[in-house]
């Protein structure tokens, strides 16, 4: 192994390589490899052979400009590869982001470990009455949460017991009963609950990673995937700090406003009192606009 390299490296990210970052109860994120840094974005934008200018404020200003004006290609010059362990039901949400290279642990070839996710009691809530895709904000009473957790754990343990019974093999692949024929792993796996953990390698460029983070760190995203996204956001901050600052400024803490929304703001600036009924916006649009300025 060479001890030196000519490629761009980031000391803060080098220190994170292969380190296990714990997520949820049994999950983790590990940075396996990366390519590029903030200077790579600047270099691509200027189509030069150097590392941009010698003045960091100019590089930072260019990155701000690129992100503010929705340039994409320069950010695609940076790549990062993760090793991630996550519950299957979160993996199925995650994989909807189809702009990454993924290789997942195969339960056809191997036996899944006996590890499953159980939420904290405070994270168990009823269905939201106003949003069809997420839970309500308030936790359920302690007695109800304890019952929910007991059911989730009981079902997971029972299903794993049947999983091993169907294969006639233990967690390490050893035959349980020589007189019994087990079924194929690819069939036995269908009995497992979605809170069991899977693992994958996930490689993505910075542009698409930022899109993933914008959606999955949002308060409307499911709590469990938000936890993973938050950890990855911290990694991005260490990897490309200028890009992170621009991303926070223009995406995470910024806002998109519609044409009607801009017209309402202009009317308000001119001294007009505008309410929902006179705004020309539907109820949801109006509430989203008002929320921006609260």
From Swiss-Prot:
Keywords: FAD, Flavoprotein, Methyltransferase, NADP, Nucleotide biosynthesis, Transferase. Its EC number is 2.1.1.148. Its cofactor is FAD. DUMP binds at residues 93-96, 104-108, 189, 216. GO terms for molecular function: flavin adenine dinucleotide binding; NADPH binding; thymidylate synthase (FAD) activity; thymidylate synthase activity. Binds 4 FAD per tetramer. Each FAD binding site is formed by three monomers. It is an enzyme of class 2 (transferase). Residues 27-250 form the ThyX domain. Pathway: Pyrimidine metabolism; dTTP biosynthesis. Transmembrane segments: none annotated. InterPro entries: Thymidylate_synthase_ThyX, Thymidylate_synthase_ThyX_sf. FAD binds at residues 73, 96-98, 104, 205-207, 211. A motif (ThyX motif) lies at residues 96-106. Pfam families: Thy1. One of its GO terms (biological process) is dTTP biosynthetic process. Belongs to the thymidylate synthase ThyX family. Homotetramer. Catalyzes the reductive methylation of 2'-deoxyuridine-5'-monophosphate (dUMP) to 2'-deoxythymidine-5'-monophosphate (dTMP) while utilizing 5,10-methylenetetrahydrofolate (mTHF) as the methyl donor, and NADPH and FADH(2) as the reductant. NCBIfam families: thyX. This is Flavin-dependent thymidylate synthase.
């Amino acid at each position: 192994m060479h001890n030196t390299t000519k490629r761009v490296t980031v000391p803060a990210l080098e220190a994170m390589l292969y380190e296990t970052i714990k997520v949820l109860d049994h999950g983790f994120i590990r940075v396996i490899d990366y390519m590029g840094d903030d200077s790579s974005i600047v270099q691509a934008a200027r189509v030069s052979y150097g590392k941009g200018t010698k003045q960091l404020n100019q590089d930072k200003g260019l990155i701000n400009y690129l992100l503010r004006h929705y340039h994409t290609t320069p950010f695609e010059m940076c790549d990062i590869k993760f090793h991630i362990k996550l519950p299957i039901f979160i993996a199925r949400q995650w994989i909807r982001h189809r702009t990454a290279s993924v290789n997942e642990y195969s339960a056809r070839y191997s036996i899944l470990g006996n590890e499953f996710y159980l939420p904290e009691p405070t994270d168990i809530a009823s269905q939201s009455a106003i949003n069809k895709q997420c839970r309500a904000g308030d936790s359920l009473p302690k007695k109800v949460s304890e019952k929910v957790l007991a059911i989730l754990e009981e079902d997971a343990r029972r299903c794993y017991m049947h999983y091993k019974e169907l294969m006639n093999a233990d967690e390490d692949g050893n035959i349980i009963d020589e007189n019994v024929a087990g079924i194929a792993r690819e069939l036995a796996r269908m009995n497992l609950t979605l809170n069991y953990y899977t693992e994958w390698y996930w490689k993505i460029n910075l542009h698409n990673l930022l899109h993933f983070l914008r959606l999955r760190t949002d308060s409307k995203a499911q709590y469990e995937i938000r936890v993973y996204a938050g950890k990855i956001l911290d990694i991005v901050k260490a990897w490309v700090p200028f890009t992170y600052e621009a991303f926070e400024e223009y995406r995470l803490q910024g806002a998109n406003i519609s044409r009607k929304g801009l017209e309402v703001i202009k009317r308000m600036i001119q001294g007009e009192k505008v309410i929902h009924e006179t705004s020309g916006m539907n109820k949801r649009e109006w509430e989203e606009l008002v929320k921006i300025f609260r």
